[in-house]
Amino acid sequence: MNGAELKQKLMAKAKEIGIDKIGFTTADPFIELRERLKESQDKGYASGFEEPDIEKRVRPEHSLPEAKSIIAIALAYPSKLKNPPRSEPGAYRGIFCRASWGEDYHHVLREKLTLLAAYLQELVPKARTQVMVDTGALSDRAVAERAGIGWSGKNTSIITEEFGSWVYLGEMITDVYLPPDTPATDGCGDCTICIDACPTGAIVQAGQLNAQACIAYLTQTKGFLAEAYRTKLGNRLYGCDTCQTVCPKNRKIHFDHQAAFQPDPEKVKPLLKPLLHMSNREFKEKYGQMSGSWRGKKPIQRNAIIALGHFKDQTAIPDLIELLMNDPRPVIRGTAAWALGRIGGQAAEEALRQAKGKEQAEEVLREIDKALDMAHAG
Ligand code: B12
Ligand code: SF4
Ligand code: SF4
């Protein structure tokens, strides 16, 4: 069977196993990406979550010797919640980004790619394959762009004609030759809506992100969140969708045919207060299947505290005092102090003063002092 015939068969199989979009490219090095990754590292824009070895990232043969082709796939995920529960005074809610709705996409895409790889091996028994989703060495976006899945938007997301940017990406490298597709071309034109809408100015120029300033990244950090960003976080518990929700290419785009990505509204828009006292076990049981739980419960709890401060939720004061006084984690005590300072009031101020008398950790004491100033000024 020649490459073109193989490709046709793979495309038909992909459809059968529920892959929404498939594209093909060569395993040639990603030359342009090399410069971009280098610049991102040099300027301190990288998140640190990506593979640090640039050569591994741009040369597919580092992942699979004698690589010849890459098969890129995309799966669409929903952008809207049916009957979303509403935040109400005293019962405020946080939000997980859409890429964390439903089952963890890593498993779902990997499973489909593994089925596709098995099929290729049926057709070409000597074929070798390497499957990747997010955590692999390659840039999933650079692969998708070159394989014609979608163009690289100014917000850095891959945007497909059919599903907008609400797609997960993954790929399979193989040593089998498959004719490449045409790379996607820019569809943003003069638009700059995402750049203007980004709350932290993290899109430093069209297509280039300073991940260190991106809320999606900041929600995943484990330490204290720099003060300047706390008020920008809003009620985000994990990730940030702003530069995608504002994008005109996503207007009216909502695909919920992938059963695995159906969100449970109570999980993706949970009440904030119950999150504060969750045990590790409860957290794992409730959120363990979501991709947004990969950093554990601490960042989510820290962000929940910030969200309560953002809403100035008076009814959260007793919970926040409890954390300030008794939580063993300095980041949680210090962030609770910040939230109490923001909410203000006599009970908050008194608790902060009391905590100041017994707190040992320098960084928490600094937060308490600032919070007392804030409570006083407010
Ligand atoms: C590290 C990482 C992050 C970091 C950094 C993101 C970033 N933009 O670099 C953080 C934590 C911030 C993040 C956030 C998100 N991520 Co993320 N992330 C990754 C990861 C693991 C590596 C990305 C990377 O290498 N970045 C470094 C840059 C330099 O590389 P790159 O983005 O791949 O480069 C492309 C473009 O950015 C562009 N580019 C880069 N530099 C420059 C410079 C110029 C001048 C120009 C014009 C273009 C350009 O060229 C490349 C080809 O398209 C990938 C998975 C993977 N292995 O690739 C997922 C991935 C990119 N993330 C994904 C998702 C869904 C998200 C979020 C939407 C989740 C959320 N809702 O919070 C946000 C989006 C934030 C944003 N504006 O990008 C999806 C993207 C799907 C899509 N449709 O594009 C991926 C592909 C995971 C997956 N397999 O589905 N992510
Ligand atoms: S994900 Fe949020 S913070 Fe990051 S670039 Fe987009 S709008 Fe800005
Ligand atoms: S908002 Fe505009 S510039 Fe940004 S990604 Fe969408 S189309 Fe491109």
Where is each model-derived feature located?
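Auxiliary alpha/beta "docking" domains used to position bulky ligands
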Residues: 1-187, 360
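Short, charged low-complexity linear segments at domain edges
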Residues: 159-183, 210-229, 280-284
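Structural detector for internal amphipathic alpha-helices that build alpha-solenoid repeat scaffolds
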Residues: 301-313, 333-345, 365-378
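Glycine-rich phosphate/pyrophosphate-binding loop
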Residues: 265-302
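Alpha-helix N-cap/helix-start positions at coil->helix boundaries
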Residues: 294, 298-299, 314, 328-331, ...
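Iron-sulfur cluster-binding cysteine motifs and their immediate structural context
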Residues: 193-216, 233-260
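Amphipathic alpha-helical scaffolding segments comprising HEAT/armadillo-like alpha-solenoid repeats
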Residues: 282-286, 313-325, 345-357, 378
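Long C-terminal interaction/binding lobes of large macromolecular proteins
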Residues: 2-10, 17-22, 330, 350, ...
